């Protein structure tokens, strides 16, 4: 039996309103629990369009057929008009998710975090995280115990900023296994549970065809000797590609693969490491990457 942590990122208003209810229904039918990370502030994701001037981002948008993948409402959100606030407008959906799944903070403003957090000072970052956590806690009526940085934009500054909130774990980076990042003080910080597997948009049209993706991914999972963590998006697997996701769950069950919330991957003793800026194939710009203590 292979256990895989299932992380669901919810980036947008449409992903929350349309994608999450579909995913909740799918997961219920398959008796699966996951970790769902919500963006709760304004939906300004359309402001990423300026990144089309960057060749790597343009190529990613073209090979993943972004217009049909996400829809024009997502691609233009927050451009010609102020972005709609996601959280309170979809409070019933978020509360329903929290009844059955582990719920955490993705971001207050996903676009702002992904585009600007790398240049924020620590207090700005702390204030932004606090705003998101406060809003999510108001909605679900209980403390939030986990978070996942938008776009995996995380480094030492993010690690230090999140320590103020005493969360059970964060999932801010890409890597191979759960670990504890070393703080500036030299002490171990809050546990990190990295995403270990590629997302749909990182590999489609580059490493694999859409129709071959599920078999390709299951091969990766079955060959993984560590603790696999897979991320889906409410805007993708909950919308245009929900049938592909259902097929993945059916095929995974046949192969003895089970999915679980990320917290089930935590153990008593974790290795030490750091979160450093790096790059991965298929994703434009820097992101947080796991570095085991003592390695370079």
UniProtKB/Swiss-Prot annotation:
Keywords: Antibiotic resistance, Hydrolase, Lipid A biosynthesis, Lipid biosynthesis, Lipid metabolism, Lipopolysaccharide biosynthesis. Residues 2-260 form the NodB homology domain. GO terms for cellular component: membrane. The keyword Lipid metabolism applies. Transmembrane segments: none annotated. Pathway: Glycolipid biosynthesis; 4-amino-4-deoxy-alpha-L-arabinose undecaprenyl phosphate biosynthesis; 4-amino-4-deoxy-alpha-L-arabinose undecaprenyl phosphate from UDP-4-deoxy-4-formamido-beta-L-arabinose and undecaprenyl phosphate: step 2/2; Bacterial outer membrane biogenesis; lipopolysaccharide biosynthesis. Its EC number is 3.5.1.n3. CDD domains: CE4_ArnD. Pfam families: Polysacc_deac_1. InterPro entries: ArnD, Glyco_hydro/deAcase_b/a-brl, NODB_dom, Polysacc_deacetylase_ArnD. One of its GO terms (biological process) is lipopolysaccharide biosynthetic process. It catalyses: 4-deoxy-4-formamido-alpha-L-arabinopyranosyl di-trans,octa-cis-undecaprenyl phosphate + H2O = 4-amino-4-deoxy-alpha-L-arabinopyranosyl di-trans,octa-cis-undecaprenyl phosphate + formate. It comes from the Bacteria. One of its GO terms (molecular function) is hydrolase activity, acting on carbon-nitrogen (but not peptide) bonds, in linear amides. Catalyzes the deformylation of 4-deoxy-4-formamido-L-arabinose-phosphoundecaprenol to 4-amino-4-deoxy-L-arabinose-phosphoundecaprenol. The modified arabinose is attached to lipid A and is required for resistance to polymyxin and cationic antimicrobial peptides. Belongs to the polysaccharide deacetylase family. ArnD deformylase subfamily. This is Probable 4-deoxy-4-formamido-L-arabinose-phosphoundecaprenol deformylase ArnD. It comes from Escherichia coli O17:K52:H18 (strain UMN026 / ExPEC). The gene is arnD.
């Amino acid at each position: 039996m292979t256990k895989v942590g299932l992380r669901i990122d919810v980036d947008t208003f449409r992903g929350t309103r349309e994608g999450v209810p579909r995913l909740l229904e799918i997961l219920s039918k398959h008796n699966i629990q996951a970790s769902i990370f919500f963006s709760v502030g304004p939906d300004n994701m359309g402001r990423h369009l300026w990144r089309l001037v960057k060749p790597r981002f343009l190529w990613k948008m073209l090979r993943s057929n972004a217009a049909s993948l996400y829809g024009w409402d997502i691609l233009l959100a927050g451009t010609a008009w102020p972005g709609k606030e996601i959280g309170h407008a979809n409070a019933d959906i978020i509360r329903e998710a929290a009844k059955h799944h582990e719920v955490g903070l993705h971001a207050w403003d996903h676009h702002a975090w992904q585009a600007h957090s790398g240049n924020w000072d620590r207090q700005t970052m702390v204030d932004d995280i606090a705003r998101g956590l406060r809003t999510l806690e108001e909605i679900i009526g209980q403390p939030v115990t986990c978070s996942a940085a938008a776009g995996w934009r995380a480094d030492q500054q993010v690690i230090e900023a999140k320590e103020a909130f005493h969360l059970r774990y964060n999932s801010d980076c890409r890597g191979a296994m759960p670990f504890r990042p070393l703080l500036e003080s030299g002490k171990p910080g809050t546990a990190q549970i990295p995403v270990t597997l590629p997302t749909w948009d990182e590999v489609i049209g580059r490493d694999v065809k859409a129709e071959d993706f599920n078999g390709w991914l299951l091969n990766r999972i079955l060959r993984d000797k560590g603790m696999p963590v897979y991320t889906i998006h409410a805007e993708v697997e909950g919308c245009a590609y929900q049938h592909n996701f259902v097929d993945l769950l059916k095929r995974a069950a046949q192969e003895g693969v089970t999915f679980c919330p990320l917290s089930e991957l935590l153990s008593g003793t974790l290795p030490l490491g750091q979160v450093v800026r790096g790059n991965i194939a298929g994703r434009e710009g820097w992101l947080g990457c796991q570095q085991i203590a003592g390695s370079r």
